[in-house]
Curated annotation (Swiss-Prot):
Residues bearing PTM 4-carboxyglutamate: E46, E49
Taxonomic lineage from the root: Eukaryota, Metazoa, Spiralia, Lophotrochozoa, Mollusca
Organism the protein comes from: Conus capitaneus (Captain cone)
The name this protein goes by in its record: Alpha-conotoxin Cp20.3
Function field: Alpha-D-conopeptides act on postsynaptic membranes, they bind to the nicotinic acetylcholine receptors (nAChR) and thus inhibit them. Through its two C-terminal domains, this homodimeric protein would bind to two nAChR allosteric sites, located outside the nAChR C-loop of the principal binding face and at the adjacent binding interface in a clockwise direction. This toxin specifically blocks mammalian neuronal nAChR of the alpha-7/CHRNA7 (IC(50)=0.25 nM), alpha-3-beta-2/CHRNA3-CHRNB2 (IC(50)=2.8 nM), and alpha-4-beta-2/CHRNA4-CHRNB2 (IC(50)=28.6 nM) subtypes.
UniProt keyword Lipid metabolism, yes or no: no
Length: 94
């Protein structure tokens, strides 16, 4: 009976580790393309106008009702993007 319990425990834990590994890669981003960036830049994502929150900086969190809350870009000309390894943020010209 103890062997059966160990086998069942391994069968329960093993799939979780594979799921976590795949989930971690998906969150960090893949090098094949930036599908999330394209998703965020579509017109129906409820992107709000960026507000001054970090003066003088070209990087910050972007205003998105479902994603970033009240954290905003430094300038109104910035657009919301997804940067690999840095997460959601702003892309500002110049």
């Amino acid at each position: 009976m103890p062997k059966l319990a160990v086998v069942l425990l391994v069968l329960l834990i093993l799939p979780l580790s594979y799921f976590d590994a795949a989930g971690g890669q998906a969150v960090q981003g893949d090098r094949r393309g930036n599908g999330l960036a394209r998703y965020l830049q579509r017109g129906d994502r409820e992107v709000q106008e960026c507000q001054v929150d970090t003066p003088g900086s070209s990087w910050g969190k972007c205003c998105m009702t479902r994603m970033c809350g009240t954290m905003c870009c430094s300038r109104s000309v910035c657009t919301c993007v997804y940067h690999w390894r840095r997460g959601h943020g702003c892309s500002c010209p110049g």
